[in-house]
Amino acid sequence: IDNVVDKDKFENLKALNDAELNVGYLSEVQILKLKKSMKETFNKGLSIKTLASTLISKDIIPHLYTEIDGEKVIKLNQDIRSLIVARTETIRLSGLGALENYKNNGIQKTRWTAAISDRTCPICLELNGRVFIIDSFLTDVEYPAHINCRCALSPVVIE
């Protein structure tokens, strides 16, 4: 990623993003249950909203709490948090599956395409249009870049 984004700028943006997410990490048990639910949902061809509902009904994704003035307050409710996890993990798996498909068909490069709008984050703006060798992308780049990332990966067949 060194040749794509100024390393200090990238690390600063990533640190801000990580700080926001660290309080919401899932336990190993929750991750295993999430994977199982995702597999079942995908195998049945169901939607992201259905996956989010499953995560709620099985109590896999709880409310995210914070403390304000010594009082425990809901920072992110279970409904919204489940939808965010379902959407982000679906995008991640879809993108990684696409990269494997590209590789299996002899395509060696991928292009990062950001959904450009007033909501596009600085990381995605920096990565937009960049071309990566798939093998190094899989080890060097975080995809999706953050929760609710709307970016896509496309094959590069002609440069």
Task: Annotate each PLM feature.
Residues 1-145, 154-159:
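Domain-core detector
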